[in-house]
Amino acid sequence: YELLRNVIPEEFRKTVAGICVDATSLTMVLLAEDGRALSELDGWSEAAHARVKLWNYQRAQVNADVALNLARNLQVAVLGRTGGSISCEWMLPKLLEVRDEAPEIYSKIDLAMDLCEFLTFRLTGQLVRSIGSLSYKCLGAEDLSFPERTFLNGLRAGFYEEYCHFLLGDVRKPGECAGVLRSELTKRWGLPEQIPVATGMLDGHTSLA
């Protein structure tokens, strides 16, 4: 919040017409039921698996390998959209790592978001998913469907239901409005009311827009 306030010179604040956030993907943020990141909960700021996992976090490679082998054996259709791969830097392997290594943290997850989605959520208060992230590095689709139940439950029992819940939200495309800037933020930053905030984008997609 403070960074954005400092980035926009005061003389330009009244001319801001819209906001869009992009971030390197997939940077995973886990949320509790009250909308806070798990790392914001009391006593969890230093818990490794509650903290943001940056896009280049690669400790979940074993999970990625197992998921890819199973997806190939089952001929899961989503591989046609991912170039036939599942990276350890994506949502699914990272979530499996938390599930296996920190069940007490995993049990507190309500939602899992890519950073561009999380920041947009914080700006607007609206739970909006970016189709760019969801359909690629979360292995989902625009209609919020995910790989076959057999595939996800083949990785861990009950994982299909968990994964679908973690990625709930209103799916929108780049350029579509996710909501308007929250009133308390317009006051804090000295910006006009009702500024539209676009759906979050992946940084690589932004460079092509």
Model-assigned labels for residue ranges:
Residues E2-A209:
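Glycine-rich phosphate-binding/catalytic subdomain of phosphoryl-transfer
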